[in-house]
Amino acid sequence: NEDGYNNVIGTDGLFTFSKYWKFEYELFLNYSKEVIADWIDSDERFSDFTVALDGESFNGSALYSTLRRDTENWSTRIRYFDISPEFRSDLGFIVENNLKRISFFQGYTNYLNKELIKRLSLSSRYELEYDYSNNYTDSKIEGYFTSASVLDSTFLYNYEYNFLNSYL
């Protein structure tokens, strides 16, 4: 039985360009070598590698980035995720790989600060997800309505329409 390893290094940052515009990112790289063991009995493959624990070495990456604009009432986000098929983080925080996802978010919040209703928000989001073979895996649009009232109670209504998948 040969020892394996999984080393992950990363960096993150938040850049403020003006009162309203910000860019943030997280970037991780991993360097992995599998143990040699018969724990997994599978012929499946990812990229050029087997799922079996046969001592292969591979490197992967993960990127999260957001360009955002926030004013008193408006919030805009453009987000991009990119997790390579070879990325591994054995801590369990990242539970999927082989994906690229871009999303667009726009929201409006009215701070009424009345006795019963403190805040009303209306927002929408579009998300497109695909894998490293450029197969679309998810495409959806969502709408949100949120009302915040006394004693920090919140009502949230969410509607999602998925263009590729149906869960009925």
What are these regions (language model features)?
Residues N1-N7:
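A conserved hydrophobic secondary-structure block that centers on an alpha-helix together
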Residues L14-F17, F23-L168:
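Exposed, low-structure sequence patches enriched in small/polar residues
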